[in-house]
A protein has these predicted regions:
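PLP-dependent amino-acid enzyme catalytic core
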Residues: 1-211, 215
Length: 218
């Protein structure tokens, strides 16, 4: 199977997986003077209110299986050394940390999340609700990432699952990006089901953690 198909197959093995709605907004498209406008509604993705679980889940699965492209979550669980279970570490300002913590809970792993100043109480509670150990800092996101690096270095068995890269740390961020291909694959299939060819489209992430697809032609 193609990489995107392997990613989608894995996501389909996760509890609560379902294709999220693609909603057409014809009146808004007319107001904007474009052919067609679609909103990919990620507000109910796996009951986590954001698409970030797609990237975090695949990155965690790949990290735990040494990049074996696991077919399902059972294969990931089987790869975990019960005597040396790793701790998942991440810095976050919201949904990424919750997604990493959710995967840790699903896999029976400990999780430590570093949260910078300015994150809402609701977001913090959501992450804590997934069972993560929370560290709040009086600093910005970059400082949170640095502390997450330090925490990872102090532990014998830890995996830093960060959605940004730096020299020497590229593989996990790349896996996170691969995870998002499921969203694109779903959208492609949903557009095909409309029965009309979309010759060109633009993808825009908007604040409510959805993706907007706009096509210049009908």
């Amino acid at each position: 199977p193609s990489p995107a198909k392997e990613v989608a197959r894995f996501h389909q093995s996760l509890p609560n997986y379902a294709i999220t709605p693609l909603i057409e907004l014809p009146e808004v498209a007319r107001e904007l003077g474009i052919g067609r406008l679609f909103v990919k509604d990620e507000s109910a993705r796996m009951n986590l209110s954001a698409f970030k679980i797609l990237g975090a889940a695949w990155a965690v699965a790949q990290a735990l299986t040494d990049g074996a492209n696991p077919a399902d979550i059972a294969e990931v669980k089987a790869a975990i050394d019960s005597e040396n279970k790793p701790t998942l570490i991440a810095a976050t300002d919201g949904n990424h940390g919750r997604a990493v913590a959710h995967m840790a809970k699903r896999l029976g792993l400990e999780c430590a999340i570093v949260i910078p100043d300015g994150v809402s109480e609701q977001a913090i509670n959501n992450i804590a609700g997934e069972g993560a150990e929370i560290t709040l800092i009086d600093g910005d996101y970059d400082e949170a990432v640095e502390l997450a690096k330090e925490i990872t270095a102090t532990l014998d068995h830890a995996i830093h699952v960060q959605d940004m890269s730096w020299p020497g740390y590229e593989q996990i961020p790349n896996w996170i990006i691969e995870g998002y291909t499921t969203l694109c694959a779903e959208t492609d299939e949903q557009l095909r089901e409309l029965g009309k060819h979309i010759s060109r489209c633009t993808v825009v992430e908007i604040e409510e953690h959805t993706s907007e697809l706009q096509s210049p032609e009908a």
